[in-house]
Amino acid sequence: DLGTTHAVVSWAPCEAGAEAQVFPIPQLVSLGETEERPLLPSFLYAPLPGEPPSDPFGDAPWAIGEVARRRGREVPGRVVSSAKSWLCHAAVDRTAAILPWGAADGDADLPRVSPVEACSRVLSHLRRAWDEAHPGHPLREQEVVLTVPASFDQTARLLTVQAARDAGLSARLLEEPQAAFYDAMAHLGLERFEKLLAD
């Protein structure tokens, strides 16, 4: 789930009856301290000159995850948040480096990123974390499904697919309400269901 505020990786072996598991995502939680957490905040932070390296996967010039969320509260002009929401904002060029939104134009050491690239960087962090934990089963070789809001129009969906492709993933999209329905079915033990249509 490439969420607006958090991303999560849930996975299951392809065998019948296999239980889904949440993948613990390594990330910086403070400058210089890495932890595995079930959620990766969908935040990017551009470290100030002289701050330690950005994250366990060398996402320079951006720090991604919990440290980005925390530092973003302290230095708000250097953080990108809610990048996924920008994918459906038709009034801006979603492929242009417009984020962090509202940051001072004259800040020469502040990198800029497009909404598509910001989403791709979050997905890339997830891919590299998975690949490091599962070197014999890289994520690019797995069947990847990304959930998207039902409100995403065709352009936002295509941009999500582009972000995944830019992160080295081939992904199928699934609307979030449909994903929730499938999850509820699995928890109820319903392997098969029939639809009743009524007027």
Label each region the model flagged.
Residues A16, D153, A180:
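Flexible, glycine-rich phosphate/dinucleotide-binding loops
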